[in-house]
Regions:
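Sec-dependent signal peptide recognition
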Residues: 2-10
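Hydrophobic h-region of N-terminal signal peptides that target proteins for export
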Residues: 10-19
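Ser/Thr-rich low-complexity repeats and stalk/linker segments
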Residues: 21-168
Length: 168
């Protein structure tokens, strides 16, 4: 009985390791090194009308600051951007690793900010027309809204981590 328990325990150990190494949907090389206090765009997510901005602070306790900025007041979001501390994105909970953005520090070549952008699909198939476009017709949308059959929105979230040794 003890042997079977230990075998099951050993077989389950690698599972979290594989989950942590999820392959992102979008792969890009690392961004160009950024100077301390230089505000830069990390990623734009037009579906959520959101731009992720960041900057290295020079503070050892919080070396990188990441902010979410609304792209435009007129932008109508087709996706939600959720706080990663509230939703804890992971593949186990239905999220997909969309992209991993690496931003090296110009003043400390051993340190980089790593931003994981996660996407949670709405879970529905989108019907495309003959031109390959998703069309939303006002009268159909009003009818669906009146019937309480609004489509779920996809969601995005971003997780910030620091990699490498601090230079101070």
């Amino acid at each position: 009985m003890k042997v079977a328990f230990h075998l099951i325990l050993l077989a389950a150990l690698p599972l979290p390791l594989f989950a942590a190494n999820a392959k992102p949907e979008i792969e890009r090389p690392a961004a160009s090194p950024q100077a301390v206090a230089a505000l830069h765009t990390v990623r734009q997510i037009p579906e959520a009308c959101t731009r992720i901005e960041g900057r290295f602070t020079g503070d050892a306790a919080a070396p990188y600051d990441m902010q979410l900025v609304r792209i435009s007041a007129q932008c109508q979001a087709r996706a939600a951007f959720l706080d990663s501390t509230k939703v804890t994105p992971s593949e186990a909970s239905g999220w997909k690793l969309n992209e991993v953005v690496r931003i090296p520090s110009a003043s400390c070549n051993t340190q980089q900010a790593l931003i994981e952008v996660w996407r949670k699909p709405a879970g529905q198939q989108v019907a495309l027309d003959g031109q390959g476009q998703n069309r939303v017709y006002l009268e159909d949308a009003k009818t669906q809204a009146a019937a309480g059959r609004l489509a779920a929105l996809p969601a995005y979230s971003a997780v910030l981590r620091m990699e490498g040794a601090s230079c101070r």
